[in-house]
């Protein structure tokens, strides 16, 4: 999301444009007016439009701030829900002593793999796969009493059976079975268990939330339920009580929706009425993009301007199908930015079309030139 308050080009810097305190106040005044962070009397599209449009008075905002910094002349609208917190199967901590939002949220370390063999979870959610810091997973959660767990659903559009931390489309209720039935058309698992695992302490919701992200079959992708999230984590060897899982789901959904909003902004630049739909997605946290490597190098040279140089905590590739059936691959790097002034976690997404075709290269060049012109004004 390109914020009018952002002063640099790097995706890790800038201020969060969301007034988080306003949501908390409005929700305290009328706690029954929201479901999973969305007003009951508002349509999803209009809510997201107001949330992510510039200079718009926001009626409800997430507790987790997300800063999208994409060099673009197009404002990002309709930012709905989207990555996962510590201990989350979508991101694996490479440093046991790492700190930050995700690590604090899901603080316990993984049990010894010899004592409890980790089972490979499915993969299909836009926020999966990572051998970096643990990442947060969730849509837009806020204003909900932590004792009441506000749960968000499943079916997230990102990850792959090969590399994903969890695929929200598995087809097996046996939690100890590693094999899942895969849909060959999109390489996604068909289903994933909703049953509680052995020794699970906290009861988790099994309801799934429908995203704003369209599929090629005319339906919309669905996000994972808290129980499915926990099951995926359990397969990877995490043994937390599960009380933080609902928040993970919300962060995850929140970031995914933001990523899709950025993609739609790019598609508007590509031409009118491309009618983009998410065909499939991959989690490629272990594959650094040239752009991410460049930012990491700049961060080590000048951390005050470019951040710490740690690099993104996750990377996804989303395959978007247009109405003419052409397919465009988008690359998304997920960064954890410094917390906001009031202590809220802030995330930055660097979303852009991959340089797979001359058209994508031309689009990025056009985008870069427009951004430079705006900076010079």
Swiss-Prot record:
- Where are the stretches annotated Disordered? 1-29, 111-136
Q: Which PROSITE patterns match?
A: CYTO_HEME_LYASE_1, CYTO_HEME_LYASE_2
Q: Does the keyword Metal-binding apply?
A: yes
Task: Cite the Pfam families for this sequence.
Answer: Cyto_heme_lyase
Q: Give the enzyme's main class according to its UniProt record, as a single word.
A: lyase
State its location(s): Mitochondrion inner membrane; Mitochondrion intermembrane space
Q: Which reaction does it catalyse?
A: holo-[cytochrome c] = apo-[cytochrome c] + heme b
GO CC aspect terms: mitochondrial inner membrane; mitochondrial intermembrane space; mitochondrion
Task: Give the chief site where it resides.
Answer: mitochondrion
What keywords does the record list, in alphabetical order?
Heme, Iron, Lyase, Membrane, Metal-binding, Mitochondrion, Mitochondrion inner membrane, Repeat
**Which GO terms fall under molecular function for this chain's record?**
holocytochrome-c synthase activity; metal ion binding
Q: Name one GO biological process term.
A: mitochondrion organization
- In terms of superkingdom, the source organism counts as Eukaryota
Bias (Basic and acidic residues) ranges: 7-22
HRM repeat segments run 114-119, 124-129
Identify the stretch annotated as signal peptide in this record.
Answer: none
State the EC number(s): 4.4.1.17
Report the function annotation for this chain.
Answer: Lyase that catalyzes the covalent linking of the heme group to the cytochrome C apoprotein to produce the mature functional cytochrome.
- Family statement: Belongs to the cytochrome c-type heme lyase family.
Protein name, per record: Putative holocytochrome-c synthase
This protein's species is: Schizosaccharomyces pombe (strain 972 / ATCC 24843) (Fission yeast)
Record lineage: Eukaryota, Fungi, Dikarya, Ascomycota, Taphrinomycotina
């Amino acid at each position: 999301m390109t914020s009018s308050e952002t002063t640099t080009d790097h995706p890790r810097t800038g201020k969060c444009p969301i007034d988080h305190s306003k949501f908390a106040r409005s929700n305290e005044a009328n706690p029954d007016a929201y479901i999973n962070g969305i007003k009951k009397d508002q349509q999803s599209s209009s809510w997201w439009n107001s949330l992510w449009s510039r200079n718009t008075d926001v009626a409800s905002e997430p507790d987790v701030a997300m800063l999208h910094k994409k060099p673009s002349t197009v404002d990002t609208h309709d930012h709905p829900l989207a990555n996962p917190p510590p201990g989350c199967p979508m991101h694996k901590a490479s440093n046991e002593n790492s700190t930050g939002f995700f690590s604090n949220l899901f603080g316990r370390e993984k049990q010894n793999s010899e004592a409890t063999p980790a089972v490979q979870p499915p993969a299909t959610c836009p926020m999966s796969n990572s051998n970096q810091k643990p990442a947060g997973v969730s849509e837009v959660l806020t204003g909900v009493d932590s004792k009441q767990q506000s749960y968000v659903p499943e079916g997230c559009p990102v990850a792959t059976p090969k590399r994903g931390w969890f695929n929200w489309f598995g087809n097996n209720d046996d939690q100890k079975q590693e094999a899942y039935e895969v849909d060959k058309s999109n390489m996604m698992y068909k289903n994933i268990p909703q049953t509680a695992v052995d020794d699970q302490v906290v009861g988790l919701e099994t309801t799934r939330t429908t995203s704003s992200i369209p599929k090629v079959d005319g339906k919309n992708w669905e996000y994972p339920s808290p129980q499915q999230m926990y099951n995926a984590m359990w397969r990877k060897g995490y043994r937390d009580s599960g009380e933080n899982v609902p928040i993970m789901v919300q962060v995850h959904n929140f970031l995914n929706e933001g990523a899709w909003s950025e993609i739609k902004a790019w598609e508007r630049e590509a031409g009118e009425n491309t009618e983009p739909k998410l065909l499939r997605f991959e989690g490629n946290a272990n594959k650094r993009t040239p752009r991410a490597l460049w930012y990491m190098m700049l961060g080590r040279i000048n951390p005050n301007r470019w951040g710490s140089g740690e690099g993104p905590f996750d990377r996804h590739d989303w395959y978007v199908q247009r109405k003419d059936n052409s397919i465009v691959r988008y690359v998304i790097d997920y960064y954890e930015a410094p917390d906001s002034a009031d202590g809220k976690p802030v995330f930055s997404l660097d979303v852009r079309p991959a340089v797979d075709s001359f058209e994508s290269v031309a689009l990025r060049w056009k985008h870069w030139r427009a951004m430079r012109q705006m900076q010079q004004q």
